[in-house]
């Protein structure tokens, strides 16, 4: 009999553990793989393997990050855990590992701590859509009233940061008890909290909308004039799909309103394509557009789906000297280049009131004013460059103008 083909039948969801140092993020990550491995739905990854996470580079920044994968009956998960607090900040801002949902780990005896708040705030600013809470180390608490107080405090913290605090599932348990248990019985009581948590993640974290189902958008990388045929723009489709006859807008890099045009052809590797979809590198032929009227850095998009803006708020991580960043602080009025999708645009930085300067290694919210509007939206990631090197990474948290 022929071998069965592996079918990816389950939806794929990206999750990650967040929370204060030593509250049990890595222990929980290891415990999830251990318990699901008993069901044959994961490979066990030990605490030490996660703790000694390999380094990756994203947008010019080095981040220590560990990826594990596992399955439930309903979904396939990729799960990220970062050993250091700074690595979390860098991962969330660069989007090195995108999260469709987060598991916030809080130690019951300690309650919410400064990094708990910081991670929740960041999760809000980088548009993590949903969160589930694992209240850890409950075996160290025998006072039910105190546990309820910690839960109340957590729900309030989540509500204050724009998450639906009253709805967020809070699962109580001990990650260490699950991880150190010798039992191979999936129904052992110490494993119940892990199964309950995965159930909550399955139920509460929504399946992400696939990029292909979103409105069309393609950042323009190059422009060619083809004699007798018109102008072709090339790039990688970021989301949605495009076909001949579609109306699209050319957006950004100008103070004029976006221009509308019609797609007269889509090509890939010199061959005609019926439809280009998210992830494809394509050439798009545009009707009635001169070679000089379109440039790299603009985007091609479904009409009305994205607008050009020049002023926005952003959450930014400023690289340390050791990471190849600046050696000195910068002040309000600093004018670096912002590398947004396919282009560098000069912009001025305005620091929040009461903040005199920004040091290398800081994580800060700032307002940015570009010299020309570009297509941006909340959640969009960018790099800050100066003299050809990356000095920071950011994510748009709000549009101002």
From Swiss-Prot:
Keywords: Cytoplasm, Elongation factor, GTP-binding, Hydrolase, Magnesium, Metal-binding, Nucleotide-binding, Protein biosynthesis. Disulfide bonds: none annotated. GO terms for cellular component: cytosol. Residues 81-84 are annotated as: G3. Mg(2+) binds at residue 26. Residues 19-26 are annotated as: G1. Residues 136-139 are annotated as: G4. It is found in: Cytoplasm. Its EC number is 3.6.5.3. Its main location: cytoplasm. It is an enzyme of class 3 (hydrolase). GTP binds at residues 19-26, 81-85, 136-139. Residues 10-209 form the tr-type G domain. Residues 174-176 are annotated as: G5. It catalyses: GTP + H2O = GDP + phosphate + H(+). InterPro entries: EF-Tu_GTP-bd, EF-Tu_GTPase, EFTu-like_2, EFTU_2, G_TR_CS, P-loop_NTPase, Small_GTP-bd, T_Tr_GTP-bd_dom. Coiled coil: none annotated. Transmembrane segments: none annotated. Residues 60-64 are annotated as: G2. GO terms for molecular function: GTP binding; GTPase activity; translation elongation factor activity. Monomer. Belongs to the TRAFAC class translation factor GTPase superfamily. Classic translation factor GTPase family. EF-Tu/EF-1A subfamily. GTP hydrolase that promotes the GTP-dependent binding of aminoacyl-tRNA to the A-site of ribosomes during protein biosynthesis. This is Elongation factor Tu 2. It comes from Roseiflexus sp. (strain RS-1). The lineage of its organism: Bacteria, Bacillati, Chloroflexota, Chloroflexia, Chloroflexales.
């Amino acid at each position: 009999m022929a071998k069965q083909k592996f079918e990816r039948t389950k939806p794929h969801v990206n999750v990650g553990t967040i929370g204060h140092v030593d509250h049990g993020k890595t222990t929980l990550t290891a415990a999830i793989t251990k318990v699901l491995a008993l069901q044959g739905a994961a490979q066990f990854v030990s605490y030490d393997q996660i703790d000694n996470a390999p380094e990756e580079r994203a947008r010019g920044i080095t981040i220590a990050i560990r990826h594990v994968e596992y399955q439930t009956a309903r979904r396939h998960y990729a799960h990220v855990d970062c050993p250091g607090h700074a690595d979390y900040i860098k991962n969330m801002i660069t989007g090195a590992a995108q999260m469709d949902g987060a598991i916030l780990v809080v130690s019951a005896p300690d309650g919410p701590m400064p990094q708990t708040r910081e991670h929740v705030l960041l999760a809000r600013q980088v548009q993590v859509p949903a969160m589930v809470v694992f209240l850890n180390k409950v075996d160290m608490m025998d006072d039910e009233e105190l546990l309820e107080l910690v839960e109340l405090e957590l729900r309030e913290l989540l509500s204050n940061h724009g998450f639906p605090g009253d709805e967020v599932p809070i699962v109580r348990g001990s990650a260490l008890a699950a991880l150190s248990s010798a039992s191979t019985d999936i129904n052992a009581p110490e494993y119940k909290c892990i199964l309950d948590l995965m159930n909550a993640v399955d139920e509460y974290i929504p399946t992400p909308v696939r990029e292909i189902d979103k409105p069309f958008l393609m950042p323009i990388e190059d422009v060619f004039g083809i004699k007798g045929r018109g102008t072709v723009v090339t790039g990688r489709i970021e989301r949605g799909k495009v076909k001949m006859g579609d109306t699209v807008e050319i957006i950004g890099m100008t103070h004029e309103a976006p221009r509308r045009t019609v797609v007269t052809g889509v090509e890939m590797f010199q061959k005609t394509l019926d439809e280009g979809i998210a992830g494809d590198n394509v050439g798009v032929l545009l009707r009635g557009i001169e070679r000089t009227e379109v440039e790299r850095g603009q985007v091609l998009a479904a009409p009305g789906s994205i607008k050009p803006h020049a002023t926005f708020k952003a959450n930014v991580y400023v690289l340390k000297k050791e990471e190849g960043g600046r050696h000195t602080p910068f002040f309000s009025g600093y004018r670096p280049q912002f590398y947004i999708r396919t282009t560098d645009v000069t912009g001025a930085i305005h620091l929040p009131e009461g903040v005199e300067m920004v040091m290398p290694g800081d994580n800060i919210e700032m307002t940015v004013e570009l010299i020309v509007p570009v297509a941006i939206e909340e959640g969009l990631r960018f790099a800050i460059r100066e003299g050809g090197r990356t000095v920071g990474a950011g994510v748009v948290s709000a549009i101002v103008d």
